[in-house]
From Swiss-Prot:
This is NAD(P)H-quinone oxidoreductase subunit J. SUPFAM superfamilies: Nqo5-like. The gene is ndhJ. NDH-1 can be composed of about 15 different subunits; different subcomplexes with different compositions have been identified which probably have different functions. It catalyses: a plastoquinone + NADH + (n+1) H(+)(in) = a plastoquinol + NAD(+) + n H(+)(out); a plastoquinone + NADPH + (n+1) H(+)(in) = a plastoquinol + NADP(+) + n H(+)(out). One of its GO terms (molecular function) is NADH dehydrogenase (ubiquinone) activity.
Amino acid sequence: MENNSSPESSEEIVKQNGIVSNQLSQDGITNESLGNDHIGVEILSVKPEKLYEAISTLRGYGFNYLQCQGGYDEGPGKCLVSFYHLISLGDIQDIKEIKEIRVKVFLNRDSDLSVPSLYKIFKGSDWQERETYDMFGINFADHPNPTRLLMPEDWRGWPLRKDYIQPDFYELQDAY
């Protein structure tokens, strides 16, 4: 029987880790490849303290549009996640395929829930970050207007967390 346990070629390693993940690593930005989603979009994870640097670098690679920023809760006792979906937009005549990347930051709900705001890189992250703060309690450091977007300012808790307990009563205020 033949032993097929030879070391993987560098091309196979690149396919496993992802092209963008490998490039970020070569540029000194620690990240973890999470594979590709069902349509082939590469997904990677970075630590909160590396997010701003990673997104700045990705913008330099040509991912010049923040299509979506959001958050989700993996479940009670598990991580809260802030995610970023970036795409590369160029001249509409030259686009053969849209290049996409998704970046995730996993936050332990029992520790610091802060990530850097991307407002200085992508102005469109303003309301998206505010909504994520409002629904999940993830703080965006250096955000220009870190206030609630959908819920009243005096609302307690984060309604889209899976461990959220809905209040029995909340007094509605008249609009006039």
